């Protein structure tokens, strides 16, 4: 009985071990983004429109897949936001500029950590080095918004086959996402994350069901595999132990019958002697 319990516990731990990839799959970078990003609207309104923020920008990030530039951009955003934080005093007000920027720095630092731990086949480097440039608050936080939004597509299988090559005809001045004339658009209620510009939103709106199906399939396969393996081991063990259990029961019954016969014979001899 003790061996049976030990084997059952072993099977349970084996299923948990095989089920572990499902838990890891759900640990997406998007979970690092908190609702603190909704304070960006207030921060942009508080900063002067002609204020310049230094940032090393990846050329062509508007045409390249997100996995080509996201690792570089989050690092550069972390540096720029940290420098911006140093320029403000630590005011105790809950929604002061310092407090908002400090929360954004923590979010970006978490994303940097997530990218560093990401598989190299999903995150690649752009062929061009980032260029130091100056951006207005609207332009800077538009890039911030797109970088935050890019983590939603980081797990896409299609991105693995995309090349990180920028056309030689592309110039930074033609980048629509950093154009001064482009309005700074944010949703009225920024709850979970900030949307990027209309082209990225339209692109994602065409396949949300397909993306969700792929993610659920990736998560379900390890779970199904672990359950099948666990049941297979359990069935094999039960089939192997069943004959032994049957023989054990038969032996116990035979021993009991032999004991009863011996007792009857003993009583019969005692009766004859009397």
Curated annotation (Swiss-Prot):
Glycosylation sites recorded in the entry for this protein: 90, 97, 145, 196
Instruction: Name the keywords, alphabetized.
Output: Cell adhesion, Cell membrane, Cell projection, Cytoplasm, Cytoskeleton, Disulfide bond, Glycoprotein, Growth factor, Membrane, Secreted, Signal, Transmembrane, Transmembrane helix
Instruction: Tell me the Gene3D superfamilies matching this sequence.
Output: 1.20.1250.10
Could you give a single Gene Ontology term from the biological process aspect?
positive regulation of cell population proliferation
Q: Which residues lie on this side of the membrane: Extracellular?
A: 26-215
> How this protein is processed and modified after translation, per its record?
A soluble form is produced by proteolytic processing of isoform 1 in the extracellular domain.
Q: Which residues form a coiled coil?
A: none
One Pfam match, by short name? SCF
Tell me the disulfide pairings in this chain.
29-114, 68-164
Where do the TM regions start and end? 216-238
Residues of the signal sequence? 1-25
A GO molecular function term, named singly, is: cytokine activity
- Any Gene Ontology CC annotation: plasma membrane
InterPro entries from the entry? 4_helix_cytokine-like_core, SCF
On the Cytoplasmic side, which residues? 239-274
Q: Which domain of life is it from?
A: Eukaryota
The similarity annotation says: Belongs to the SCF family.
Q: How does it assemble?
A: Homodimer, non-covalently linked.
What function is annotated for this protein? Stimulates the proliferation of mast cells. Able to augment the proliferation of both myeloid and lymphoid hematopoietic progenitors in bone marrow culture. Also mediates cell-cell adhesion. Acts synergistically with other cytokines, probably interleukins.
Protein name, entry field: Kit ligand
Question: What is the source species?
Answer: Felis catus (Cat)
């Amino acid at each position: 009985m003790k061996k049976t319990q030990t084997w059952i516990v072993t099977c349970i731990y084996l299923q948990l071990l095989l089920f572990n990839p499902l838990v890891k799959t759900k640990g997406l970078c998007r979970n690092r983004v908190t609702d603190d990003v909704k304070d960006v609207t207030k921060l942009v309104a508080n900063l002067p429109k002609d204020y310049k923020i230094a940032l090393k920008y990846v050329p062509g990030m508007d045409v390249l897949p997100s996995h080509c530039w996201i690792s570089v951009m989050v690092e550069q955003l972390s540096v720029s936001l940290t420098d911006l934080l140093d320029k403000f005093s630590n005011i105790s007000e809950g929604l002061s500029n310092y407090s908002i920027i400090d929360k954004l720095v923590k979010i970006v630092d978490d994303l940097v950590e997530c990218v560093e731990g990401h598989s190299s086949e999903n995150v690649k480097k752009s062929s061009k080095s980032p260029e130091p440039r100056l951006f207005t608050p609207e332009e800077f936080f538009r890039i911030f918004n797109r970088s935050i939004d890019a983590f939603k597509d980081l797990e896409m299988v299609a991105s693995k086959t995309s090349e990180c090559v920028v056309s030689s005809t592309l110039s930074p001045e033609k980048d629509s996402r950093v154009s001064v004339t482009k309005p700074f658009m944010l949703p009225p209620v920024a709850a979970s994350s900030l949307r990027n510009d209309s082209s990225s939103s339209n692109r994602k709106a065409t396949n949300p069901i397909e993306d969700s199906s792929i993610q659920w399939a990736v998560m379900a396969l390890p779970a199904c595999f672990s359950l099948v393996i666990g049941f297979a081991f359990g069935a094999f063990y039960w089939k192997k132990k069943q004959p032994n259990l049957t023989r054990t029961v038969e032996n116990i019954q035979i021993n009991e019958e032999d004991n009863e016969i011996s007792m009857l014979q003993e009583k019969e001899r005692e009766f004859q002697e009397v």
